[in-house]
Amino acid sequence: MIFFDKLHQNISQNQSLLFVGLDPNPEMMPGRYSSQDIIDGLWDWLQFIIAETADFVCAYKPTLGFYEALGVPGLELLQKTLAAIPSHIPIILDAKHSDLNTSTIFAKTVFTQWGVDAITLSPYTGQDHVAPFLVYPDKAVFILCSTSNPGAEALQQYPTRESPLYLQVVQESKNWGTPEQLGLEVGTTNAEVLARIRQVAPERMIMVRSIWAEGGNLNRILEVGLNTDGNGLLIPVPQDMLASANLSKEIQSLRAEINQVRDITVRDVASCSVWLPDVFTVKQHPLHDLILQLYDIDCIMFGNFVQASGAVFPYYIDLRKIISNPQVFNQVLSGYENIVKNLTFDRLAGIPYGSLPTATGLALRLNCPMIFPRKEVKAHGTRRLIEGNFRTGEVVVVVDDILISGKSVMEGADKLKSAGLNVHDIVVFIDHEQGVKDKLQANGYRGHAVLTISEITSVLHQAGRINDEQFLALTAE
């Protein structure tokens, strides 16, 4: 099962956002276990914690460093502990892994041999370090973006408090993986830090740490960190509570306290959305995050650009860049797939050159054959107009990137029809919306678009990515 599906299932089943740190810390071990051999005592304590909490938490988080500090017996203890956790409860290995050279083999070890569901990573070696962990489709990572350690403040707040490094980490890490692959780890007692992170990453799961230290305010943490559904946060069980002989009773009380605040928060957000829709966007566009990512990787640029049609626009949309960002490309393919899977056809056809990678990826996803009409016919070789195998009379869905005038995509469709193929549907990622779909229909084609330019501009403007002047320039077209 995919990690976040497994996590949400446990959140719902146990009505809990709580996770437990399964850390064999001799300094925190209750006195009732101290008369035994230290490893045996820690093992008995960890078994007690699991038995007392399994019905009241959504995840377990063993910290690798504590087990490593105990040497070989500690790693053996880790194996026993992982095996003792009920299989339906997700395991987040707190490793803070940061070594690029060992990332591939370590990912294989923790995910395939140890069987953990997610892992914490340090961000500073970048996407190359994170990528080996993301190739496991049912697993996830949590990126450390902030810690509560006072000594880290000089780094985290650099260069200014208005534009701190920890927010840049959040912004950059969003491009490394989808919300279904990548969450954030935030250690802080400062609700303002969490609020700023939530504002930048409204769609991400956040695992908070250190909130029970002096100065922490649980209600405020929940208020700024929860999403509109009362989820989106993972809350740690206090370490000192794990030493209690009445752990089960105490954790149920904490769960009830958190759920009470969750209920209030959800009601408050719902009421605000009715009266202040321009301020609190409770119901976001389904592709809200993708639109922002397209802007952030410069697929949308401003200036005076001459389009292929000859028209001059105050912006340019360059979707070719998506192939260099696997996470964004994957989301774009999903958008196309949601449309194409409902159509009747025999083959896909990409229009050269911009949509060929998209059509290829889509064909692989849908397990269907692909062809494409050549932009120009070679003067040598087979001189084919259509590349790829096909049979006369087959139905082809045409895939292109953007509809501006419709001229190039209809030229491609006409080439396909001249070879004896039938074309009824044209699917694009962005519709420029100047009556081009009507033009397609007048020529016998049904037009479909994942997004319209007005949807994109609306999301970018509401999110503060573009200013009023840019918004007007886009909407005036």
From Swiss-Prot:
Needed co-factor(s): Mg(2+)
Keyword Magnesium among UniProt keywords: yes
Stretches the record annotates as Orotate phosphoribosyltransferase: 274-477
InterPro entries: Aldolase_TIM, OMPdecase_type-2, OMPdeCOase_dom, OPRT, Or_phspho_trans_dom, PRibTrfase_dom, PRTase-like, RibuloseP-bd_barrel
GO molecular function: magnesium ion binding; orotate phosphoribosyltransferase activity; orotidine-5'-phosphate decarboxylase activity
Active site: 96
Pathway: Pyrimidine metabolism; UMP biosynthesis via de novo pathway; UMP from orotate: step 1/2; Pyrimidine metabolism; UMP biosynthesis via de novo pathway; UMP from orotate: step 2/2
Residues that, per the record, bind 5-phospho-alpha-D-ribose 1-diphosphate: 374-375, 378, 380, 400-408
OMP decarboxylase: region residues: 1-273
Annotated catalysed reactions: orotidine 5'-phosphate + H(+) = UMP + CO2; orotidine 5'-phosphate + diphosphate = orotate + 5-phospho-alpha-D-ribose 1-diphosphate
Any one Pfam family match given in the protein's UniProt record, by short name: OMPdecase
Assigned EC number: 4.1.1.23, 2.4.2.10
HAMAP family, sorted: PyrE
Summary of the function given for this chain in its UniProt record: Catalyzes the transfer of a ribosyl phosphate group from 5-phosphoribose 1-diphosphate to orotate, leading to the formation of orotidine monophosphate (OMP).
Family that this chain belongs to: In the N-terminal section; belongs to the OMP decarboxylase family. Type 2 subfamily.
The name this protein goes by in its record: Bifunctional enzyme PyrF/PyrE
Lineage: Bacteria, Bacillati, Cyanobacteriota, Cyanophyceae, Nostocales
Gene: pyrFE
